Amino acid sequence: MNIVHLLSQNHLTGAEVYATSLAEKQLQDGLKVYQLSNGFFAPTKAVPFKLEVETKSKIQFIKNVFWLRNFISKESIHVIHSHSRAASKLGFYATLFTRTAHVSTVHGRQHPSISKKLFNQYGQFIITVCENVKKQICRDFGYDDRNIRTIPNPIDVEIFNDYKPHLERKTDLNDFVLAIAGRATGPKKERTRLVIESLLRNSSRFKNLKLILVGSKLSDVFSDQRLIELKLSLNQIQTALQIQETEISELTGSHYKTWDAVIGSGRVAMEAALSGTATIAFGEALFEGLLTQDNVDQLFSSNFGDMHPDIFEPALNDEHLLKALEGALLRKNKPAENKIIAEKMREIFGSQQIHSRIKRLYESAYFQKNYSCWIPVLMYHKIPDQEIQSQHKIYVTKPNFEKHLKFFKSRGFTTLTFSELSLFRTGKISFNSFPKKPLILTFDDGYKDNLVNASPLLKQYGFKAQLFLLADSQLQSNTWDSGEDEPTHEIVSGDDRALWKSSAFEIGSHGIRHLPITAFANRDHALNELIESKNRLEKEFGYPIKSFAFTYGITSPGSDQLAFDAGYEYAVNTDSGGLTLEENPYSIFRVNIFPDENYWSLLKKTSSWYRRYFYLKRKK
């Protein structure tokens, strides 16, 4: 895929660091990446183009739109990823009526406007760096959260993987080194001012506390008059509080380890915690206090103090700051707890997983931009010669199945498999050749009558289907439900499974022995089931297994992430999921097909409006 990162930088910010980090990983993955911005203040390996993205001139904005439209056409750009309000607005107009998708990352509060309420300028999907940003967008703009993903800033944890606890132990706040890292502009300027003023008011509590300003200066924070007064105050208290200024272009674990505690938010808070340094979360909106192993998720929701839907400026209570400093002092004597926090942060913010999620979101956005309708995904099980006893009605007789195929043919449907969808989604096949009326036929379990009855009929009518097969090749029948409410039904087993290779079916995974995802003791066991079944089937059939079907349609919170982590590209449910296929490709809605389907029921279940109708009726 060809990607453009669109920024409006006039100085270095976290958004540019974030964009260059994404670009570097995407280049490693073989993507072609461009970076467009007013200026460049962080090294980038993407192809850079200067463009006045941030402009107050309407004429310049219109010129930018036409220039960018020409650029995406000339370079065959699949996705524009915007990283600022100005970039999102430009990206929106530049991609109108094109095949290029648009995704925006929102790092903080968005100012309300009538135009944003009337139509979504942020693209097919919005990435928010924390839950509070997502809440503000949904509340103030009325956006549907189905197209918003909370994905944290990726961090190269390898820079911080040499965790070593501080050897020196402090017994009080004497000789304590505290750092405030980050720029001193906007609300963060006020944050820094509040901390310094609080420490001055409480200087009698210290003997030798050293405050390091990293990336900012006192002159950035205070007026000339207040700066003179401040320096006089510092001279009067002598060694109780010392303030130093330092410029570090790129912070690493070795920097953080020289400080006893760090005050920061966003990326700074994450990096400090990863380094094993006591971290006090204080950002543009909130003083969250000391980061502990119990409040990581809570603090992540505000991006460690940077965002609250209803708070616009930071405030600080002296006692809260002193309590956090004392907690940091105690933490210095508990390096094991710092290590636990570092490991938890590593799990959440590790860059590899986040880069993979964003890349997959690009693909979903590209697919949604080019085909935004619901694609019917029908679910079959058994295709017996004649009627059978089945309490769950999970069969269609061979004669009726042929009627279904005749109906699909007469309605002009073209069947697709998930591997074919993948080729369109990743830009390997142009959407110019995408079928006008796509249809996905799926079969579960691997019954013999699928091979004997369904496959020949599918071939006869020029159709193909997806078979979700159990990885245990020794299973000979439906042991999970036979004897109670379903008759025993033969499953293709042993060496006969090789016959699937020449059938009308593409293989997907249905687990190993038909256990529901909720049957496993913990997440690791469930993940192993998905990975192991995938590996077995790939070894057996000799091609990548791209899709997974949750047994019984049973899922649990995080099931979609499990399928993603296991390496699948799609996962299907039974009667719940996204309103479109790529809204959540790991929770795909399937339509149950029953023995008594007729022309009108099939017409309803394959109509483009059916999924939304089902959702409004069943609320799932």
Model-derived regions: residue spans:
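N-terminal strand-loop element at the rim of the active site
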Residues: H5-I62, G215-R226
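Acidic anion/phosphate-binding donor-loop and adjacent secondary structure
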Residues: R139, R146, P154-K170, G186-E190
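A charged, aromatic-enriched C-terminal amphipathic alpha-helix characteristic of glycosyltransferases
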Residues: G14, P165, D310-E363
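Short His-centered aromatic/hydrophobic patch
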Residues: S82-S88, V106
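C-terminal active-site subregion of NodB/CE4 polysaccharide deacetylases
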Residues: N370-T442, K448-D449, T518-K620
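Conserved donor-binding/catalytic core segment of Leloir-type glycosyltransferases
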Residues: V4, K170-L200, L211-I212
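Nucleotide-activated donor-binding/catalytic signature segment of Leloir-type glycosyltransferases, i.e.
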Residues: S223-I248
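A short, active-site helix/loop in glycosyltransferases that binds the activated sugar's phosphate group
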Residues: G123-I148, I155-I159
